[in-house]
Amino acid sequence: LKAHKKGLMQQLFPAEGETVPRLRFPEFRGAGEWREKKAGTLFKNRKEKGKAGLPIYSVTMNDGLVKRSSLDRKIDDIAKPEGNRKAYRNEIAYNMMRMWQGAFGIVPEDCMVSPAYVILSPQDGVHSNFFGYLLKLPRSLQFLTSHSRGLTSDRLRLYYDDFAAISLRCPAFSEQQRIADCFSSIDNLITAQIQKLTTLKAHKKGLMQ
């Protein structure tokens, strides 16, 4: 499934130098070229102080945004709200120091995040989940790296103003949603397979004992 997803991502997004993907859903085959837009017109940087009672989330490299309390870190989860930033559902939060490696996630619910994160608020016609997949593409990570500032790789930071200057090619909202739904379905299947495998391994271990 992971190999299938990787292959689809190469087909459903335009290759470098192209304006349409090689594979397109039937209802969008006559929809024309994907338009190139500056990231700053797609997402605005929203800064709002945290609010008491909201869960605190952290950005991870592989799993996007997860509740901080679920991580194996000894961090006080009852932090002062004003010391964090509020993020709204379906926004994107990214770690400035690790965005070039793909350290970002879609906000699953209204929550608080570290003030060190940049919060991207989607504008009209922007489907966050679509861009969640788009920004994970190898060439997108290359753009994010080239726009990050720092003398060495361990000091690279992607500030919002630099992110805003990046050009991203995207289709109309309806096609964004169709592509995002496709990949979300595959991700759900992958998660279900992993959970099933974990259960079977535990069952096997129990039988061996």
Per-segment meaning from a language model:
Residues L1-E33, R169-Q209:
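Amphipathic alpha-helical coiled-coil/heptad-repeat segments
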Residues R24-K51:
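Non-catalytic DNA-recognition/assembly elements of restriction-modification systems
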Residues S70-L71, P81-L141, T145-S148, D154, ...:
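A short beta-sheet element
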Residues V59-R73:
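Short, basic/aromatic beta-hairpin or loop at an interaction surface
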Residues R22-L23, A52-T60, H147-S148:
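Short coil/turn segments at secondary-structure boundaries
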Residues P26-G30, I78, V118-Q123, A165-C170:
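Short, well-ordered beta-strand elements within core beta-sheets of diverse protein domains
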Residues I75-P81, T152, S185:
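Short, solvent-exposed loop/turn positions at domain surfaces
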